[in-house]
Amino acid sequence: MHMVGPLMTNQTLATITKRIIERSAASRSDYLARMEQMRGQGPLRGSLSCSNLAHGFAACSEQDKQTLKLTESANIGIINAYNDMLSAHQPLESYPALVKAAAHSVGCTAQVAGGVPAMCDGVTQGTAGMELSLFSRDIIAGATAISLSHNMFDAALCLGVCDKIVPGLLIGALSFGHLPVAFAPAGPMTSGLSNKEKAAVRQAYAEGKVGRDALLEAESAAYHGEGTCTFYGTANSNQMLMEVMGLHIPGAAFEPPGTQLRDQLTRAATERLCKICLLYTSPS
């Protein structure tokens, strides 16, 4: 059998990585110290005043209120990037109810901690709205941190898919890096009109051989339903990165929306968060 030797890191990449480590040493040390301090405080909702805690679970069911009064079971904070503008995010509308049910099944609770904006380059390209695209990442990061700042949560589940949204969610969640965090995506759009066929219609339109109605029909047939883009763009590469980083349940990136397996993966992400919380207790 032919044995492959150890993999060699590209020297340029190794040099850049070393430089980043050196430049960030002080700030990383401060960050880790801050996270360790936050971790040492234990369940933060247990140290909230009665008035604070009552506000935090006022809208919950009586059963959840009783659970949240204690600090023996995990409470998952859901950060949701749902809207109807992004095909990849539209399926997230139903996720909070699914997550709450999954948490209940293992004796825990879940609350929607907050929502974050999400914009699609596919909608805004060629318009002034595109100028906000990259800036939106910082808004998303801030909104994520604000959502978790209620100090009611033992873990966080981030619901988001596309570029700017996933990095923003991750950056914001790292402000609470002592908490377990997982991501749950919506999955890819099913295949529609092929790129070759779509390109042919675009060419015909450019030549004046077909009208706008035919062009729109072709574009709609190619990009036709819920889920991530039907091409290997940054929405899909973000999902691969989340899975490689261990922030997804394995296999979660490319299961289409609306399937039983898709729901099972979302439930599994919730249950996994509950299990890795130090507070996890099995239901009796």
Spans of model-derived segments:
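Ligand/cofactor-recognition surfaces for anionic moieties
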Residues: 2
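Helix-enriched interaction subdomains in cytosolic or periplasmic regions
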Residues: 5-52
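A short, flexible low-complexity segment enriched in Lys/Arg and Gly/Pro that occurs
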Residues: 19-23, 54-62, 208, 212-213, ...
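N-terminal glycine-rich phosphate/pyrophosphate-binding loops that anchor nucleotide-derived ligands
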Residues: 33-72, 85, 95-99, 105, ...
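Gly-rich Lys/Arg/Thr-decorated short loops/hinges at beta-loop-alpha junctions or inter-strand turns
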Residues: 35-37, 42, 76-83, 118-130, ...
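Long, structured ligand/cofactor-binding scaffold of large enzymes
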Residues: 58-179
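Active-site cavity-forming subdomains of large catalytic enzyme subunits
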Residues: 130-279
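Conserved small/polar residues in nucleotide/adenosyl-binding loops
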Residues: 280-284
